[in-house]
Amino acid sequence: MTVIFDQSANEKLLSEMKDAISKNKHIRSFINDIQLEMAKNKITPGTTQKLIYDIENPEVEISKEYMYFLAKSLYSVLESERFNPRNYFTETDMREIETLWEGSVEEDIKFPYTFKQVVKYSDDNYFFPITAKELFMLFENKLLHYNPNAQRTNKTKKLEGSDIEIPVPQLNKQSVEEIKELFLDGKLIKSVFTFNARVGSASCGEELKYDDDTMSLTVTEDTILDVLDGYHRLIGITMAIRQHPELDHLFEETFKVDIYNYTQKRAREHFGQQNTINPVKKSKVAEMSQNVYSNKIVKFIQDNSIIGDYIKTNGDWINQNQNLLITFSDFKKAIERSYSKKDFSTQADILKTARYLTSFFDALATQYVDEFLGDIAKERKRSFVNNYLFFNGYVGLAKKLQLDGVSLDELESKITDVLGSIDFSKKNKLWDELGVVDKNGNAKSPQKIWNFFNNLKIDE
């Protein structure tokens, strides 16, 4: 590490910056503000992002210039004397850095931006070659977006000191590192990136403009360009170029882009169809393939029920210590155990059932507040009432009540009548007699659970 004023001052500044960045790095507005401040000094957003990542890595050396500008930016954004450059740098140092700094921006690009050699498949789908340098510059200038609703995950992180969760890319660091090395070795397969120019984002009302004569495609001003597929490759390539700018022969490596002009909803559907062939996490594909009736129902419950926040999207199983009820894919299976395509003639039928099930689970959660809305993980250890396999039974029971004409207003009292006498504790020998628990006392056999609830009397 370069000595700034003296070693102790250098270490103190580094410690202060690490602390602030660790606490705020998942707050999008904070990152944006830092990037804007750094950009005033000709430092690209991508370079700033790398500095934020590197600051917590003790093996990475950060130059005196970058330390100065990062401290200056933090001082401006956070307005804290902890980051005042004057506390760490001499007047001579600061004047020298400011006057000699040439910046790290190689090329400032923005929309509108035109791609060449573009093949038009339809009015909302085009295909064209793209160089590694173009990918790098688009990413460095924040023109390519990570969209949590159109990617492989809805991974979230809690902001420190709060219960607020924000979406973040779920990056496999090992995969990114492997992609970087393959690219540097010239062995990275020239696979296709999938982008989406999100409908409704352009200020002129038209995100893509195609010229038949020149076979060129222009992405217009203010367009939001989402990366639907290829985010790991994008990060790996940009990381390689940042770390080895001297290998300019790699800049002209050519890849392919399949670009769409879809609404976010349609982009999600496209992603779901594509990944029935190229599978990713089952829960994510299930959530995004909204043309399937069960997915639409679960998504409606997720968006409208009081238990919606406890349905896990970014994973195919739930850890016993997680305060979550069920995964999206398991809820989907529970729906499909009781309902089939034949139950729905129209989209209105699906919506009607989704509303009924939402009201049912709201009423159920109201009856068992601690188990469904409180300390779910703790209650799960003593009771089966919030076990994910029991959702198979609950959906079956809800369908019985729906077919029996039980109104939405009557659901809460009816659930009390039907389930009130059932002892859901794991100590109840009934569960062993029914064959719904294994030798370790864990729930099993969703069909037997469904049978139990289906046989409950509801007309007494």
Swiss-Prot record:
A Pfam family assignment: DndB
Top-level lineage group: Bacteria
Name of the featured protein: SPbeta prophage-derived uncharacterized protein YopQ
Organism: Bacillus subtilis (strain 168)
Phylogenetic classification of the source organism: Bacteria, Bacillati, Bacillota, Bacilli, Bacillales
Encoding gene (name): yopQ
